[in-house]
Design a protein with these regions (language model features):
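ABC ATP-binding cassette signature C-motif
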Residues: 1-264, 308, 314-556
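Intracellular alpha-helical coupling/juxtamembrane segments of multi-pass membrane proteins
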Residues: 251-284, 288-294, 298-305
Length: 556
């Protein structure tokens, strides 16, 4: 198998209504063991490509075929699991062959005691079973399951799938898929619903994975550290590049340096981020160059043809005074679990606080308390007199699938009043990369990334001076992520951002709020990498390993 391609596509095309070629004439061959990052704007056909490779979407032009006999594993954005199974039952489906081999091996050993047994036949079967077990490290199976469950912070083994959140189900599906160890992994946004430490673990796992990995992801550190190839989908074409994210952008810089069409807004965007790039430690020089190259791309005339605007607009709220948010001795529990235990911190003016920690640790609960939707068990939250919160409701879930994008944001109004500003509603919606006919798309037809942008457009209408953003980076393409970073940095107010995107947190965060075990929350001045370095020095490398969260129990 090492000398052959594991998967081949020949002149593959895909037409979607109304007669739009989302993919056209793609011919690619995939090497065994290759790690491929798939990039492209939202709606470019990335998920469609993976569905074709997984054999789910067969209505295509051309030919797509895996090498005979290889095992392909696919993680869709919304995986299907048996709702009646427990977490352990769902995970053990991945290792069913090994479990059956272990059970049968015990039976074979017992059969050797029978004097009439066919010992040659038993020995042959024993050899086959031991080969299966050895190939999957089967004698260490329980440890494997526990390590994977800890790394991806799975819910309790006995929890029923039907009671899990969408994010928890997705983590269970990812864990099951990784334990199956297929020859080829097809991963659609695998880092969504993972916290930053679990993303770092997944990055290391896939870096060392022996099989082929094809991953759609917006995680730029992941693309830099794991990908050996970048496959860019641009207006239907698949353009492969051998190298990681940084080298891909370097080669684009050489071509795009000759482009003349540059727009002042994009030039300003480059300058803003280059200020950060130049302040980076020497160890990040390659990434710094990569960022420069990406912004050169955004300025090219070619780019403007495919994406008319690449700015996000955060309307300035009222002027923010010196006192922003002060939290003193905050405690909050649910049932017998303490989520937050004696938390105190003060947010200075212009701060951008990145909030990290395991799912279910209480990050969103803090937002609900800050906005007054829930009360703490004890302690105080004091907002400055000038503070106006733009708080996160679940707009992604609450949006009306039958409305158009423009209607969902504008409610039919031609002019929107946001804080002290008035802006034409179509121009405002256009600031979120919904152009022309895209504003007439039904909400129910949007991709995950498009829903994310629409969610931002609705949230930012609030016009506050302290933004509370709950996982705003989910499903966004890297271009929109860059625009969001710049918009937050240029906003004159404060922001608190729950995120697992390490590059995003490095770029924007002035402080980190980290949810640990037993309700302990750490407030640190610095960005994500600064915090990780401090944590490693203070508590040792083991402190950076993800594990199932431990809750402090309330004594009855």
């Amino acid at each position: 198998m090492s000398t052959q391609f594991v998967y081949t596509m020949h002149r593959v095309g895909k037409v979607v209504p109304p007669k739009r070629h989302i993919l056209k004439d793609i011919s690619l061959s995939f090497f065994p063991g290759a790690k491929i990052g798939v990039l492209g704007l939202n709606g470019a056909g990335k998920s469609t490509l993976l569905r074709i490779m997984a054999g789910i979407d067969k209505e295509i032009e051309g030919e797509a075929r895996p090498q005979p006999g290889i095992k392909i594993g696919y993680l869709p954005q919304e995986p299907k699991l048996d709702p009646q199974h427990t977490v352990r039952e769902a995970i053990e489906e991945a290792v069913g062959e090994v479990k059956r081999a272990l059970t049968r091996l015990d039976e074979v050993y017992a059969l050797y005691a029978d004097p009439d047994a066919d010992f040659d036949k038993l020995a042959a079967e024993q050899a086959e079973l031991e080969a299966v077990i050895q190939a999957h490290d089967g004698h260490n199976l329980d440890n494997q399951l526990e390590r994977a469950a800890d790394a991806l912070r799975l819910p309790d083994w006995d929890a029923k799938i039907e009671h899990l959140s969408g994010g928890e189900r997705r983590r269970v599906a990812l864990c099951r898929l990784l334990l199956e160890k297929p020859d080829m992994l097809l991963l659609d946004e695998p880092t969504n619903h993972l916290d930053a430490e679990s993303v770092a673990w997944l990055e290391r796992f896939l870096h060392d994975y022996e099989g082929t990995v094809v991953a759609i992801t917006h995680d730029r550190y992941f693309l830099d550290n794991v990908a050996g190839w970048i496959l860019e989908l641009d207006r239907g074409e698949g353009i492969p590049w051998e190298g990681n994210y940084s080298s891909w952008l370097e080669q684009k810089e050489k071509r795009l340096a000759q482009e003349q069409a540059q727009e002042s807004a994009r030039q300003k965007s480059i300058e803003k981020e280059l200020e950060w790039v130049r302040q980076n430690p020497k160890g990040r020089q390659a990434k710094s160059k990569a960022r420069m190259a990406r912004f050169e791309e955004l300025n090219s005339g070619e780019y403007q043809k495919r994406n008319e605007t690449n700015e996000l607009f955060i309307p300035p709220g009222p002027r923010l005074g010196d006192k922003v948010i002060e939290v003193q001795h905050l405690t909050k529990s649910y049932g017998d679990r303490t989520l937050i235990d004696d938390l105190s911190f003060s947010i200075p003016k212009r701060a951008i606080v990145g909030i990290i920690g395991a799912n279910g640790a209480g990050k969103s609960t803090l937002f609900r308390m800050l906005s007054g939707k829930e009360q703490p068990d004890s302690g105080t939250i004091t907002l400055g007199e000038t503070v106006v919160l733009a708080s996160v409701d679940q707009f992604r879930d609450a949006m009306d699938d039958k409305k158009t994008v423009w209607e969902e944001v504008s409610n039919g109004q031609d002019i929107l009043t946001i804080g002290n500003f008035e802006i034409p509603s179509r121009a405002y919606v256009g600031r979120f990369n919904f152009k022309g006919v895209d504003q007439q798309k039904r909400v129910g037809e949007l991709s995950g990334g498009e829903r994310g942008r629409l969610h931002l457009a609705k949230l930012l209408q609030a016009g506050g001076n302290v933004l509370l953003l709950d996982e705003p980076t989910n499903d966004l393409d890297v271009e929109t992520l860059r625009a969001l970073e710049n918009a937050i940095l240029e906003s004159p107010g404060c922001a608190m951002v729950i995120s697992h995107d390490r590059w995003f947190l490095d770029r924007i965060a002035t402080h980190i709020l980290d949810y640990g075990d037993e309700g302990k929350v750490t407030f640190y001045e610095g960005n994500f990498s600064d915090y990780e370095e401090w944590k490693k020095k203070t508590f040792g490398a083991e402190a950076l390993q993800p594990h199932r969260i431990k809750y402090k129990r309330i004594a009855k």
